[in-house]
Amino acid sequence: MSLLNPYFGEFGGRFVPQILIPALNQLEAAFVDARDDPTFQTQFNDLLHNYAGRPTALTLCRNLTAGTRTRLYLKREDLLHGGAHKTNQVLGQALLARRMGKTEIIAETGAGQHGVATALACALLGLKCRVYMGAKDVARQSPNVFRMRLMGAEVIPVHSGSATLKDACNEALRDWSANYDQAHYLLGTAAGPHPYPTIVREFQRMIGAETRRQILQAEGRLPDAVLACVGGGSNAIGMFADFIDDASVQLIGVEPAGLGIETGQHGAPLSHGRVGIYFGMRSPMMQTAEGQIEESYSLSAGLDFPSVGPQHAHLNSIGRADYVSATDDEALAAFMQLSRQEGIIPALESAHALAHALKLIHQQPEKEQLLVVNLSGRGDKDIFTVHDILQSRGEIQ
């Protein structure tokens, strides 16, 4: 019997080996208990404020919108300790793991931001840390790999399958199946088996709560739309959660179109996938005609995931949120524009959301609109990737 609803409409659930059911039940009970405990909430909020640096700023982009009637704000999760929104919910889950008496943390990572956040939380709270990472991602995210190792984490490259996030998730689950007595699986996104999608949303929802307060203070009204990139979907659900009941606020999630939807080289299961069971949940995913998981692709490692969190699937199915996509080239152009015009280097993941915002702005420059983009992370980790692309194009030496 679940303490919390395991489904979002028809999506979600808990499709895992029987051996993991007790661990998931224990996690759900511990979360409900901690959620209702003022002492836990005080500890969590103290870490968010004094260690992670919350609240993060809401920054008006005057240069990007010059010559238009749009006011565009960025929610600056890139300023958070660790460099991305990942730190929020990792601190929450790590505190929860310690409360449950766990001594080890298992995690997966794509871009490395979740791995870095997990490593810093484990160092802070005295927990042993091992992080699974696709071998391709280890190669393209070497700065984050070194950061994790500097903070004492064991980084384990995964060579199976596509050697990306999907495969790292599979290996992390195998490890947890063998070690759940002493280890907590610190899942990095709002996906997977119940209760993870709910836990991650609740530990990320301060993004939207702060944005709501800040935009009302700055503009005296709610935004017309909030935008966020969507891989598994944690930064987006953190931004959306406090606006879901506001019918006047459009929720826009931006999936990676990769090399173009028509090429098949993308990571857009909400727009172009089919519903199935994967990673312990029922949700849309990229599948072959035979029902096998199809390899996803994105220039941004953190969006290179073949499925999506179940609450996003539900919001999409009921028409409450709109899910669009941006290509590698569009994200790269937005990355360069923000860097050169506002002096802010975004993560390539976040640049997907910005790319769609810029499209909306320039399609109707005369339209008076108030937009907020969740700048989910900073782009330090991506500078070598971008350098190599610009060099290959002959745009830099």
UniProtKB/Swiss-Prot annotation:
Its cofactor is pyridoxal 5'-phosphate. One of its GO terms (molecular function) is tryptophan synthase activity. Signal peptide: none annotated. It catalyses: (1S,2R)-1-C-(indol-3-yl)glycerol 3-phosphate + L-serine = D-glyceraldehyde 3-phosphate + L-tryptophan + H2O. Pfam families: PALP. PROSITE patterns: TRP_SYNTHASE_BETA. Pathway: Amino-acid biosynthesis; L-tryptophan biosynthesis; L-tryptophan from chorismate: step 5/5. It is an enzyme of class 4 (lyase). Gene3D superfamilies: 3.40.50.1100. The modification N6-(pyridoxal phosphate)lysine is found at residue 86. Keywords: Amino-acid biosynthesis, Aromatic amino acid biosynthesis, Lyase, Pyridoxal phosphate, Tryptophan biosynthesis. It comes from the Bacteria. GO terms for cellular component: cytoplasm. SUPFAM superfamilies: Tryptophan synthase beta subunit-like PLP-dependent enzymes. Its EC number is 4.2.1.20. The beta subunit is responsible for the synthesis of L-tryptophan from indole and L-serine. NCBIfam families: trpB. Tetramer of two alpha and two beta chains. Belongs to the TrpB family. This is Tryptophan synthase beta chain. The gene is trpB.
